[in-house]
């Protein structure tokens, strides 16, 4: 198995990316990695001579400020574009980048290619829950607008992923809404609710509210890309603010500092449960091969878990299973 990795994407590239790749090579004997980027820079950070790591030189880098479509079209020799081409031309089984999200989605769609039968791809991160199990949220921005049939496909893709990669036997699928009652929401959610209710191969549990997402209310939560992106950023921002407030309180007085010292192991345990990097990156579902968007601020641990995630998706043949499930759903219509 070979995974192509954009060595130049992310806030801490290339060092964090390369360190994460080395961890992946050490953890998985069946894994080969193609690091794509400036060869001289990459080799200066490589601390191993493993024959399972290959470097593919790229002259250009797609910057976070670049307009996605224009960058993919014009920067043909960028690390991200060459990475996607490795997958498209069957020299790699999956690819990972912590770079420009829009550019990666563009490269995934137009270079790797969309699965036949998938109307719209979906960007789907696994987010933490209080139990530590996490849940899959899709879409978080691949498509700002959506139709009911798109959300149904999201539910199918999310269910396949949760079964094959996360090991959930019968994933509970929830529809993000403003209330749990059947008739709640706008036309999109009302129509989607009815279709999901009648879809046989989905374990649909009904509407779910944003306030319950971290309480393990569902294994897969589907919504349009606009709502999903707002939800994702609200959860991220809230978590950061809560941890900041806790830190401020715990260091405000001598007594609180002593209490913090006693509670430190439990606080660390709680932080680990909420650590996004342990869940891998956001998968771009609906493409012919796994394309993983690692968080822009990914450290080596986050890159490693994105590699683990991509490896599992390839091993379990997730893309082919999604294609089969979507084909079956369309046949039943």
Swiss-Prot record:
Keywords annotated in UniProt: Cytoplasm, Lipid biosynthesis, Lipid metabolism, Phospholipid biosynthesis, Phospholipid metabolism, Transferase
Catalysed reactions, semicolon-separated: a fatty acyl-[ACP] + phosphate = an acyl phosphate + holo-[ACP]
UniProt key word rRNA-binding: no
Gene Ontology process terms (BP): fatty acid biosynthetic process; phospholipid biosynthetic process
UniProt xrefs under InterPro entries: FA_synthesis, Phospholipid_synth_PlsX-like
Alphabetical list of Pfam families matching this protein: FA_synthesis
Subcellular compartments: Cytoplasm
Secretion signal span: none
Keyword presence, Lipid metabolism: yes
Top enzyme category: transferase
Quaternary structure and partners: Homodimer. Probably interacts with PlsY.
Entry function: Catalyzes the reversible formation of acyl-phosphate (acyl-PO(4)) from acyl-[acyl-carrier-protein] (acyl-ACP). This enzyme utilizes acyl-ACP as fatty acyl donor, but not acyl-CoA.
Similarity-based family: Belongs to the PlsX family.
Name of the protein: Phosphate acyltransferase
Species for this entry: Bacillus subtilis (strain 168)
Native organism taxonomy: Bacteria, Bacillati, Bacillota, Bacilli, Bacillales
